[in-house]
């Protein structure tokens, strides 16, 4: 199996085993997301969700395990493969949104395509289509440092979609949005996943996001999977007090 060179082809599934040591505990997460599938990762603060995102994105190295997109190897600790983020072919939105502050929303969204060699005009046109899709067309010329939290989050999502990623890894991408914008942007993401046949790993605190988007949900606590199944299955038999609180039921053992 060879290391990936550039973006993996659209239509490939994501297969990963993430082992990352974190002080008193370690993340140990196995996930498989088919092309066009959505896996939602839920859990309390400090449970390992953002560490999983960082490991998938190439922001922290694996102590053991691998990340594969189809037949392409993005990381393999045993084989010494660890591609940098820009070579993984992923569309990533981090919980702490990172935009280039002095660039406009349009320039931020077009940045990846320009860096890949696309000419300025088509890159801008593509960026404008995505900004319109996420409801940010009126702020295309606004510098990123002047965007509100919700606007910056939508710009970051548009930037992730703009590079035609082979997979999406989104960490709390709707957290700063109001209810109307949240539903609209969720629909944009769902349409992209369905039409482009890309796998999506969605980290969220909101069960509604998981119910609306995900085929499968897993719950992480202290780096370990404590429950896995279809979104509606969580309410039937919550495995921990956190899951019971999430679904609005009595605690385990009550």
Name what the model sees in each region:
Residues 74-91, 115, 234-238:
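ABC ATPase NBD coupling module
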Residues 228-229, 237:
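ABC ATPase "signature
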Residues 72-76, 121-139, 190-191:
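Conserved ABC ATPase "signature" region
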Residues 103-112:
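Short coil-to-helix segment of the ABC ATPase nucleotide-binding domain corresponding to the Q-loop/switch region
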Residues 162-166:
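A short, proline-enriched helix->beta-strand linker immediately N-terminal to the Walker B motif
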Residues 222-223:
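Conserved ABC ATPase "signature" C-loop
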Residues 143-147, 151:
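Conserved ABC ATPase signature
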């Amino acid at each position: 199996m060879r290391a990936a060179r550039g973006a993996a082809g659209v239509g490939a599934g994501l297969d990963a085993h993430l082992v990352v040591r974190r002080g008193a505990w370690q993340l140990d997460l196995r996930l498989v997301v088919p092309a066009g599938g959505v896996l939602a990762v839920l859990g309390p603060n400090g449970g390992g969700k953002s560490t999983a995102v960082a490991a998938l994105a190439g922001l922290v190295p694996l102590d053991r395990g691998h990340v594969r997109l189809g037949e392409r190897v993005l990381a393999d600790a045993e084989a010494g493969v660890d591609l940098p983020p820009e070579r993984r072919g992923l569309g990533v939105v981090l919980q702490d949104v990172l935009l280039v502050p002095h660039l406009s929303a349009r320039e931020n969204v077009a940045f990846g395509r320009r860096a890949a060699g696309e000419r300025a005009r088509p890159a801008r046109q593509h960026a404008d289509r995505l900004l319109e899709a996420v409801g940010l067309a009126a702020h295309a010329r606004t510098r990123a440092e002047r965007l509100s939290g919700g606007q910056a989050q939508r710009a970051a999502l548009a930037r992730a979609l703009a590079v035609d990623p082979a997979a999406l890894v989104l960490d709390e991408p709707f957290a700063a949005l109001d209810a109307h914008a949240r539903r609209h942007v969720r629909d944009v993401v769902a349409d992209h996943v369905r039409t482009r046949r890309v796998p999506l790993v969605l980290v969220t605190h909101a069960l509604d996001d998981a119910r609306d988007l995900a085929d499968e949900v897993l719950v992480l606590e202290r780096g370990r999977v404590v429950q896995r199944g279809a979104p509606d299955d969580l309410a039937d038999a919550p495995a921990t007090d956190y899951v019971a609180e999430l679904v609005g039921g009595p605690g385990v053992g009550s």
